[in-house]
Amino acid sequence: MMQIDYLLTAIFDPDRGPVLQYQCPENGEASDLHFLAELMLPDRVHERREDWSLFFIHFSKKSNVFSLFSNVDDINFEPSDSNMYYVLNTIRAKRVEGTRRGGSVFAMAICTTFPHVHALKPLLDTAWEIFDSSPSLKTLSMLHKSFNLHNFQSFYQKLSLDSSLILALNNFWSFFNLYLTNSPHIMNDIINKDIDNIPKPGSELIELSRDSYNSQATFCLSAESQERYVTCVIPSIHIPECVGEVSISNLINTFIDGPSPFMNTDISADINPINVLITALLISKKVLFLTKTSSASVLADFVLSSCALVSGATGLLQGLTRITFPYIDLSNVESLVKLPGYLAGVMNPAFTHHADWWDVLCDIDNQTIQVSSNLFSDATTTMDTKSLFNNTSPFTPISKDNQDDEIFIKDLRKFLKADDKETLVRWRVRLYIQSFIRKATSYEALFLESSPLNPYYKDYKFKGFGWSWDNDDEKVNELLYLAPKFEAWRQASTYKDYCYRLHCASTPVLRCMDIQFHLDRLRNSSLSTTDAAEIFLALESHIRTEEDVNYLLSNCPLHSGGLSVIAFGLYHISDKVRKAVSKLLNRIETHKYGKLFYMALNKVDISTHVYINSQHKKKKDSF
């Protein structure tokens, strides 16, 4: 049962500094959580009446203790949340005349394995108010008991990652405004229990965005003769690596127009700061976010948004949360800098004077990203790392790769102006990370003769995988240029985690063909009718199960055309191909999410599909 494992309070003592005041339960699975006091009361906490923070701690089953740092040398890449806990923390400062330091500072935190812990802010807010009126271990214990009358796991749906992506990347209501306005009952026929939490159309038109997949939970907090009811709005779906109320669009908008990150180095690469940030996170460099004026909650949002960013904004890459620290202080620097790579947030300006502590510094206040000059010094850098960052650096553009990066940044700028900017930005970031993974797959297969990124390609029933180039020379040139970047990523935790998850994947079609590769060929290449026919026939042949359709739909978001790339086969010159595509669309139409994608097709495509079905039925009836 998923619950609130610990409820904690901390105070700032004028003589001892941050001190853990109460902990409930006192003797839990691992009772020593005193190290949390420093994190619960961050730097400059006295400057604000209240603040929030969110961070992770790790439980070691071997030593039976909690720690801020996971054992990086002994990471188990099997996906599991059992050893990582989320800590949501509220901070309060009181001005009291006549007291030392002019007042007092308190904090209350909940520690849980519940990934949507940020949604419990109203609950923690109310718990603090109750505790503040009668601060004692007894009050804290009663609040902890009230919290755990609920099973938090019941608040979100157990969906596959592909199903979660379908719901997160598609704004279904915007595609069905006409249906909702004229015939609201239509939606009742096409939405089943898996998406019951979507707001139903009523007298007014409802706009559904990425953040609308929520459920409401009402808690009753009872302690010391007080009884308070609190309602929390909790996301119904969970995307790995996307923790908190992150805004990737805000992160990108903050740094996209910044100056060159290489101003303090001898590298003259003209590359956007966003590309530098993504590359640094991909290859597990030490990335530090700094603010001297913003709140701890703002700092945490930037760090967590960066974690989501490098995941492809959709959990495509996982594992970075193990080395992510939304807030860290000077007392933990020694352990932090020993890590081969990290993503962290700090509020102490002392970090700016120690370029040996970080590789990339993201200054939130000045909206700049800076690469450490120490990264290129003979004293601190091996020859392999130096070659990674000079003319063969993953940060240094060549013509083709630079064009891809420039198009990526151009698209981001355009999407940042859109009404549904967060969804569009996430989709574009996913495509960018996806293209990197697919090129890395082609690199491994060509130069290493096998690819852990795709262990099935040699046995594919329908050949073709990785990235698609116009010719072999272009392919070899780009892969050779990107080789240092690929090799650096192959040492990163996100690479190892991705390989493990793909090896354990149960979706049947993944073992038969590379759907992404062939969808791109249909979208972007000048295919002959024969080549197109082979792809359409292979899709119909291998996309059979519900998981297969889920995977297909997760690669066909509505705002990039949806099923139109499939429907194009309805107009093929071959009757066999037209029938095959019609059968595939029939399969998709009966799928729980596929029916929504099908209805988003234009009227001509739907009419053509209906006509082909009817003709096929007539021929069958005539025999």
Swiss-Prot record:
Q: Which pairs are disulfide-linked?
A: none
Domain cDENN, chain residue ranges per copy:
248-386
Keyword Nucleus appears in the UniProt entry: yes
Q: Does the keyword Nucleotide-binding apply?
A: no
Stretches assigned to the dDENN domain: 388-476
Query: InterPro entries from the xrefs?
Result: Actin_polarity_regulatory, Afi1_N, Tripartite_DENN
Keywords from UniProt, A to Z, are: Cytoplasm, Nucleus
Q: Name the Pfam families on file.
A: Afi1 (PF07792), SPA (PF08616)
Q: Which domain of life is it from?
A: Eukaryota
Principal localization reads cytoplasm
Task: Give the UniProt entry's GO cellular component terms.
Answer: cell cortex; cytosol; nucleus; plasma membrane
- What processes does the entry annotate via GO biological process terms? actin cortical patch localization; establishment of cell polarity
Q: Where is the uDENN domain?
A: 5-204
Where it sits in the cell: the answer is: Cytoplasm, Cell cortex; Nucleus
Which function does this protein serve? Involved in polarity establishment.
Family that this chain belongs to: Belongs to the AFI1/mesA family.
Q: What is this protein called?
A: AFI1-like protein C776.06c
What's the source species' lineage? Eukaryota, Fungi, Dikarya, Ascomycota, Taphrinomycotina
